[in-house]
């Protein structure tokens, strides 16, 4: 899953270990699956993984949390034979619910009531990375931008920022554990309310060697943030800024909130402040319903002209309940050809 999911998976493992669990892959008593729902393929993979976990571990407690789990119904829970379904802002409760299930409690669904209105921070913590050589540090959750193709706001909820002091303290513990590299992550990192201050505080930690962003929306890359990054010796010269399309008409239909020229100006400004060696990578969606052949060519021309270091290209996937899903869809062969 995404970097936010990876952080949450490690933090859940740490919480279970704190209650006496031992991480392992053979004959587990507890299987925790941190799910994703960004595309229809992600949904299918989650269901497949849950079924496999149950088939291979018939007596284990199977817990599903994360974005796909946020929308699981009781009928789906029964069909997939999941013991615990946990919503996106309640993952800190997993050790408690696992203990209840192991003690003979009933299967359950614990999902946030109105996640798009609740201002709740899921209080997971991590002292050191367990599965990676670099540490992901989640400092933000949720999104309220409602791009027309995106299901994330309905499953991740209202934007919320982790308290600055708490985030810095976790970064200190991680670096003092022997991990010198931190990747700041969130569902929409640019909505963190004190991001420049956070960069300066973490960058000043005595044992930090490398600081990165997972991904940041272009509008959040402003002069205040760029100055903080330029003043941070630990910051690695890389920004991943999702573009999605290089065509203004498609960007408008996507409700991205910027034009291609705006993105180009932000990229140029970032290179002007951080240096021409700045590596800018991006995401490019192909096959959006309003993307005709001319729009696709304009998007390609824009990408070629901007000089990205890396482009992650992926096909549009309709998500039920989003405005784009109600639009007339392109033929699948057209999408795959692009």
What is the role of each PLM region?
Residues 291, 306-308:
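Contiguous mid-protein beta-loop-alpha structural module that forms a pocket-lining wall or clamp
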Residues 1-185, 191, 224, 239, ...:
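Proteins enriched for Cys/Gly/acidic motifs involved in redox and nucleic-acid/cofactor modification
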Residues 62-66, 71-72, 175-292:
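Conserved SAM/AdoMet-binding glycine-rich loop
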Residues 36, 157-160, 214-216, 256, ...:
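Hydrophobic alpha-helical scaffolding
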Residues 42, 163, 259, 292, ...:
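Residue-level preference for long, well-ordered alpha-helices that form the structural scaffold
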Residues 2, 192-208, 254, 318-338:
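Radical SAM enzyme [4Fe-4S]-AdoMet core and its adjacent flexible, acidic
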Residues 264-266, 272-281, 310, 320, ...:
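C-terminal accessory region of radical SAM enzymes
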